[in-house]
């Protein structure tokens, strides 16, 4: 049978482990090698301490306490406190908007009775009555007038032991401190044209941003830090704030070392990453109420942006890893809403974005070290998707969100439509965020993560800003480009090739002749005959077989067989120590993994549907272990795979491992299996449907889950190539004998070929539907 190819891959998985072990032993051998390091030895051999090298930071850190500055006249910035620090009594500060506000602050020493003093305010001698009854604290008096020729009136006062005062322009008002330290507070009064109000300070002062107002209040009430009260702190002119510093640019090329032929250049670059997710939404056959798969797919995106006045053309490829499989089963009826599998990314998942642009930094990305990157986080939120049912209200999957956090960067090779490019692969870890996702009109709600159904939420792209730095070994002559090659750190990304190959494979389903397929399904396909249609296969048959087995041993099928083998081994050892096979939950637990469910069977249809669906997913393994003479689903899928490989124009040695592994997992996702007991047949499918019926009349009988599980343990499991609905339709329209019924139930290939040669439309339609399910 054609399914021999899958059996060979499963049976020979140990040879891959042995090959890896021999290879590791070879690596472990050591030799004494004398190395003569040249000027660029560190590029061939990793430095002792790997680090990012020089990464320039363009972030300006604003100090909390800026100053002290010398007395001056200037227009202070809005939302900044002027912290005034006078040494002697007298005029501290004056300011005006030259329209309707003239204000001044004077300082009075302790122990002053009411007296009239003369102050020069705005160039005019003013007589001001002042007093300070405190014996220890200095008194700041805030004065104000509204016309140039008017008289000053007292607005507020501040009794201060530290001898500090503050003033600020904010929100259309002029703010000052009042009250008494250490409990001084702020107060403000409306000032028109306040942002153009100029100040003249007659003492040293500091500048503090408003977002640090709590610190400013702390200074007003308790004094400046001790370091500010030493003679080592010298006030400077306010003009020093306008000094232009020659800072290193974020986007620059630094030559680290150079010889006649080669040089090391550090590239520091700003980067704007734009990416989008792609997905595949596949409906099952039938009446239109069921979806077989909603999954993430790699997505390419090309765009332009400006970096330091230069227009950059960039290309990204987004892919995901570590997806979580969810499903929803609304029931066993043909009109029940079902999603067999939909993918969700969450905390245990990763998102990969390959980035390349046409700048100088990517011209020689071959010999690279000290690669590092700093990227912002980005929130990805899911949108709505309507499941368009033929009749009734449509369920809607809505919501879901994840935050992407930069988790690393490495080299990779990115494939565009025309050329492969050495690029950077950014890895992002995920955290689940609000909102949760749900499916309306179902019980699926309050689940966290980002489902694949509408991950872009109708956006064109997601965007991440950041920067990266790398040191590259490049030719000293800038006109010469390093020969394109892939270093050992570069991972070959085949997703683009595989995507095109999948499209071609799925289109070839229409070109397969059913009669030839049955004949091919009966042939014992081995690895050599499977690969015989691929160009250059014979020259690399050994390495290809090894690569296929390496990939195949990581498949879900191989993992399930491995788990099943361990379970059976444990069950066998337990039986030898127990008098009853039921004491280890019987062999059913090893085959079906539902022994706990069988002990408490509910009579509801949904419960039976769930149990039979769980059992039927494991029946493929039982069928592989107990080969019968009938044809099975794997024979058909292997025959379709062989036919498509022979017809494909894009199949190659480097993508055949992915194709075979994916075919073993995804070909014919909707399968039904049956067991026969005398005249009774029990049939269950992976989508939860189940039937029990008589062979002669095809009359349905009650489905006994416990008996079905017992028969699965003791009887051969048969692929329902011609399922119950097709058999009943065939009998109602054409009439079949009891012997023909038994042969079709056993999936006898001889009888199948007879019906196909007779051009029976019901049987042909069933086989065609199976072929259409052979999709990548």
UniProtKB/Swiss-Prot annotation:
Segments carrying motif KID motif: 644-646
Region spans: Spike head: 65-224
One GO cellular component term: membrane
Keyword set, alphabetical order: Capsid protein, Coiled coil, Disulfide bond, Hemagglutinin, Host cell membrane, Host cytoplasm, Host cytoskeleton, Host endoplasmic reticulum, Host membrane, Host-virus interaction, Membrane, Outer capsid protein, Viral attachment to host cell, Viral penetration into host cytoplasm, Viral penetration via permeabilization of host membrane, Virion, Virus entry into host cell
Motif DGE motif, residue range(s) on this chain: 308-310
Region (Hydrophobic): 389-409
Gene Ontology biological process terms, A to Z: permeabilization of host organelle membrane involved in viral entry into host cell; virion attachment to host cell
Annotated site location: Cleavage: 231-232, 241-242, 247-248
Matching InterPro entries: ConA-like_dom_sf, Rota_A_VP4, Rota_VP4_MID, Rota_VP4_MID_sf, VP4_concanavalin-like, VP4_helical
Family: Belongs to the rotavirus VP4 family.
The name this protein goes by in its record: Outer capsid protein VP4
Originating organism: Rotavirus A (isolate RVA/Equine/Japan/HO-5/1980/G3P[X])
């Amino acid at each position: 049978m054609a399914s021999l190819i899958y059996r060979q891959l499963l049976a020979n998985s140990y040879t891959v482990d042995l090959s890896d072990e021999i290879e590791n032993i070879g690596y472990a051998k050591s030799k004494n090698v004398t190395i003569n390091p040249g000027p660029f030895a560190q590029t061939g051999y990793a430095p002792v301490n790997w680090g990012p090298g020089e990464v320039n930071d363009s972030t300006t850190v604003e100090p909390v306490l800026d100053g002290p500055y010398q007395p001056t006249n200037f227009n202070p910035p809005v939302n900044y406190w002027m912290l005034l620090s006078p040494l002697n009594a007298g005029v501290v500060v004056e300011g005006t908007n030259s329209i309707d506000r003239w204000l001044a602050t004077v300082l009075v020493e302790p122990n002053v009775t009411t007296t009239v003093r003369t102050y020069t305010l705005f160039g005019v001698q003013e007589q001001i009555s002042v007093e300070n009854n405190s014996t220890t604290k200095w008194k700041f008096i805030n004065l104000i007038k509204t016309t140039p020729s008017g008289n000053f009136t007292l607005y507020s006062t501040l009794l201060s032991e530290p001898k500090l005062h503050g003033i600020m322009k904010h929100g259309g008002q002029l703010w000052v401190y009042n009250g008494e330290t250490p409990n001084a507070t702020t107060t403000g009064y409306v000032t028109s044209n306040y942002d153009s109000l100029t100040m003249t300070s007659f003492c040293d002062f500091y500048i503090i941003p408003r977002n640090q107002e709590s610190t400013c209040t702390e200074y007003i009430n308790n004094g400046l830090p001790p370091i500010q009260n030493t003679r080592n702190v010298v006030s400077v002119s306010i003009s020093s704030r306008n000094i232009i510093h020659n800072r290193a640019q974020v986007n620059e090329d630094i030559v680290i070392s150079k010889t006649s032929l080669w040089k090391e250049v550090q590239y520091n670059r700003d980067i704007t990453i734009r990416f989008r997710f792609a997905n595949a939404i596949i409906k099952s056959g039938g009446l239109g109420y069921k979806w077989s798969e909603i999954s993430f797919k790699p997505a390419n995106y090309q765009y332009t942006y400006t970096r330091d006045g230069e227009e950059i053309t960039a290309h990204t490829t987004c892919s995901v890893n570590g997806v979580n499989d969810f499903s929803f089963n609304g029931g066993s009826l043909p009109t029940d809403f079902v999603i067999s599998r939909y993918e969700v990314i969450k905390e245990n998942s990763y998102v990969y974005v390959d980035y390349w642009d046409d700048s100088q930094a990517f011209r020689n990305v071959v010999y690279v070290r000290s690669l590092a990157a700093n990227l912002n986080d980005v929130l990805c939120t899911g949108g709505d998707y309507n499941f368009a049912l033929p009749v009734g209200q449509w369920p809607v999957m809505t919501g879901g969100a994840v935050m992407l956090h930069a988790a690393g960067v490495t080299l990779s090779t990115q494939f565009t439509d025309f050329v492969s490019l050495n690029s950077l692969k950014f890895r992002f870890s995920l955290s689940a965020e609000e909102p949760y996702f749900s499916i309306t009109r179902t019980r699926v709600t309050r689940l966290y993560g980002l489902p694949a159904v509408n991950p872009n939420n109708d956006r064109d792209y997601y965007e991440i800003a950041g920067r990266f730095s790398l040191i590259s070994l490049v030719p000293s002559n800038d006109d010469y480009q390093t020969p394109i090659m892939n270093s050992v750190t570069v991972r070959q990304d085949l997703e683009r090739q595989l995507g095109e190959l999948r499209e071609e494979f799925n289109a070839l389903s229409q070109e397969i002749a059913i009669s030839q397929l049955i004949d091919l399904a009966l042939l014992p396909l081995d690895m050599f005959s499977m690969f015989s249609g691929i160009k250059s296969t014979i020259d690399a048959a050994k390495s290809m077989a090894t690569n296929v087995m390496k990939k195949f041993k990581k498949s879900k099928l191989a993992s399930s067989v491995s788990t099943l083998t361990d379970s059976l081994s444990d069950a066998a050892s337990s039986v030898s120590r127990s008098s009853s096979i039921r004491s280890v939950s019987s062999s059913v637990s090893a085959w079906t993994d539902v022994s706990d469910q069988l002990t408490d069977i509910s009579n509801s249809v949904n419960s039976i549907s769930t149990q039979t669906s769980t059992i039927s997913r494991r029946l493929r393994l039982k069928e592989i272990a107990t080969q019968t003479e009938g044809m099975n689903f794997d024979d058909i899928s292997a025959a379709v795979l062989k036919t498509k490989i022979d017809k494909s124009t894009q199949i190659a040695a480097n993508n055949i491992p992915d194709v075979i592994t994916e075919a073993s997992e995804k070909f014919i996702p909707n399968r039904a299996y049956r067991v026969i007991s005398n005249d009774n047949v029990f049939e269950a499918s992976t989508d939860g449907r189940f039937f029990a019926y008589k062979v002669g009349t095809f009359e349905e009988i009650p489905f006994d889950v416990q008996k079905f599980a017992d028969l699965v343990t003791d009887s051969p499991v048969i692929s329902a190539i011609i399922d119950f609905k097709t058999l009943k339709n065939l009998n109602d329209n054409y009439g079949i004998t009891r012997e023909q019924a038994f042969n079709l139930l056993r999936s006898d290939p001889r009888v199948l070929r007879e019906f196909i040669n007779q051009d029976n439309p019901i049987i042909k339609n069933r086989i065609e539907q199976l072929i259409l399910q052979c999709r990548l």
